Amino acid sequence: MHKIEKKWQKIWQEEKAFQVSNESSKPKYYVLEMLPYPSGKIHIGHVRNYSIGDVIARFMTMQGFNVLHPMGWDAFGLPAENAAIKNNSRPQDWTYSNIEYMKKQLQSMGFAYDWTREINSCDPEYYKHEQKFFLELYDRNLVYQKESLVNWDPVDNTVLANEQVVDGRGWRSGAIIEKRYLKQWFLKITDYAEELLNEIQNLKDWPAAVRVMQEEWIGKSTGVNFHFKVKYHENTTIEVFSTKPETIFGASFIGIAFNHPIIEQLICKTPEIVNFITKCSYITRSSEIDKAEKEGIFSGLYVIHPFDANIFLPVIITNFVLMDYGTGAIFGCPAHDKRDHELAIKMNLPIKQVIETGNIQEGILINSDWLNGLTSSEAKQKVIEKFEKLGIGKRSVNYRLKDWSISRQRFWGCPIPMIHCKTCGVVPVPYKDLPVTLPDDVSFDSNYNPLEHHSSWKYVNCPKCDNSAIRETDTFDTFFESSWYFTRYCNSNAVEMTDKKACNYWLPVDKYIGGIEHAVMHLLYARFFTKLMNEHNYVSIREPFKGLFTQGMVLHATYKDENNNWLYPAEVVKKGNEFFHKENNTRVVQGRIEKMSKSKKNIIDLETIREQYSADAIRLFVLSDSPPEKDLEWSASGIEGCSRFINKLENMFEAIFSLKDDMKSEINKDLNRLIHLTIKHVADDIKTFSLNRAIARMRTLTNAIYYEISKDRIDVRTIKYGFNVLVQLLNPFIPHITEEIWQKLGNKERLYKSVFAEFDESILELSTYIMAVQVNGKLRDTYEFDVDISEDEVKQITVNLPKVQKFLAGKEPRNIILVPRKIVNIIV
């Protein structure tokens, strides 16, 4: 198989098989898998993702489409920098070496990529365009810098966006996140929150789960902002945001965020308060708040109820109010809010019911003075009107989504093209001086950004006044590069950021394939970037991905030795029902079956498996054992079965090729119908990404043809036709062996250039059908009827069948129950 695979990979390369033109009379189809980070090796999870995309690309090509199927590299990022620190090397050397190796791996798998469009995000020829675009956004006031409380990863020594903090820990390092105030660059994604939210409903070909995740992340809330006066400090107010102002008479406290400004202004920071604030600082996301136990501490302050000056509400510093949502303050109504209720129970605060049914949602107002008897919606309007009349509140819309923090305090990223001058302030780098590139001669002798200590790079003259100034030493968040790369594939050699004409032809991406873990960050940022690029005339679209498919993960068992160290599967051998270390024969503990990951070493080396089996066998296995959207458990027996199937195809070719045509033989209608049914269903299955079902159907056809070969009297013409069809249907899945067999079958045209097999609708129509014949509900016979027979004729024929007459014993049936084309039940 390896010789066959190398042969066809060479042919495809020489024939430029998968290069596509931007000029074509064919309809276009743009299929794209999320580009990989060049970490060193392609893993099986990648292979599954890329195999799914490759099936679609090859199938759509055979369907007559001009298919764009590119590949590139998301090449900036922390792993390269960490490797440089560890190995005393340069990040670019590590990155480019990995790209070279991983590209060879992808090519060895036979993926149909147009490599002429390859992009590399760490190439200055790529990132110079995003630097210019950043400056264009700055000119539109869509970029700003401010000091803000950020998520600081103490291991990676950089800031993380909220989306990059998982359960209070850094998404890569796993370190507990700290809160720090730093100057950061932001993009105003919140200016586009409403459009990003509204357009979700038009993403019909996206998984519902992803749409819901984006809706929840944007998190639109409609309510009111209003002010409470602080007791004894009546010139000072606390502004709260509420979506349920009608419950104001049930308020028993004010909850504020741990970093609310009033804490610095008026609150005496006792040791208990300081400790509580420190504890709260580890909670960075509302998803973590939902899981956390609700806690609070009395601040020492009270506020005055806006509608009753005799009611004073305690101000509680809480762990479930965030400063970056709403105003950083809420009023707590424990009777009608779960979180407020939990805190009230813990702190012994009053719980006053103000909705008659006690519902958290809606009902009739009680215990609410002038709101009594109103419905919740009526009361809400009346309260808001009162706030507005008193001048203490106004209607407001809030979003959970916050502006995108794009600054990272690391070296291996795209430099932010700004200069800091003591005289002129912040000055953009002139367009003519782009790209701002990274220096080659950096030292990684510490765990901090080496740009801070590189004097010849850091110190420059101000473009405005020519005085000494300092470059911005932060680099872009790597999601910046991956937010627009799909537009660059349309013409990766474009002089400008994009080739507008090429983008008009190819975009939007028809099918985007990747993991659901990117549902919020990457996909949201890419949607945002597309809207920005549209407004700058780089693209004509405002949504980048027409269709989205999220594949499941590849799983494998985990293993640990007696010292609790992770082991690779290749280091473990099974003896009976137990596991042992191959080298020292010590006992090994098998852990959970989990997503393949380097950290837990439960990964399969692609090169080892490919050498042992074949690229086609791997492709077939990752597509056949589970629906593509579900997780797939790696199985040695599974890939062995796929390898045997490929060998079976080769053996079938030898057997079929030697058969002599017999023009007098009767056409095998059943086999011919199965062939055409398989063509129809496989095409439908590929279109709906039911790839495992398509493979199952082709296995059924394979077995049917194999069975026919073994008969004494056979229809050679239909067998040969069916085998030709089978090879063609299998080609998008296992392209190497099918190209080889196709050629040996005497076909002149390359299989990748052929038109996908078409079915004949008339052959699918049955001329007869078989019915089960029952007497008193028990099967007594079967009978084959013509499709155009009437129900009365069916009843007449079945009653007179000898096996039925035996049970009738000369009597007339009491009733005949007919289920058309399935069952006739004669009641005696």
Swiss-Prot record:
Q: Which segment of this protein is annotated as the motif 'HIGH' region?
A: 36-46
- Describe the reaction catalysed, as an equation: tRNA(Leu) + L-leucine + ATP = L-leucyl-tRNA(Leu) + AMP + diphosphate
Q: Where in the cell is it found?
A: Cytoplasm
Q: What is its EC number?
A: 6.1.1.4
Picking any one GO biological process from the record gives:
leucyl-tRNA aminoacylation
Molecular function (GO) terms listed?
A: aminoacyl-tRNA deacylase activity; ATP binding; leucine-tRNA ligase activity
Q: What is this protein called?
A: Leucine--tRNA ligase
Write down the species.
Rickettsia prowazekii (strain Madrid E)
Query: The organism's lineage?
Result: Bacteria, Pseudomonadati, Pseudomonadota, Alphaproteobacteria, Rickettsiales
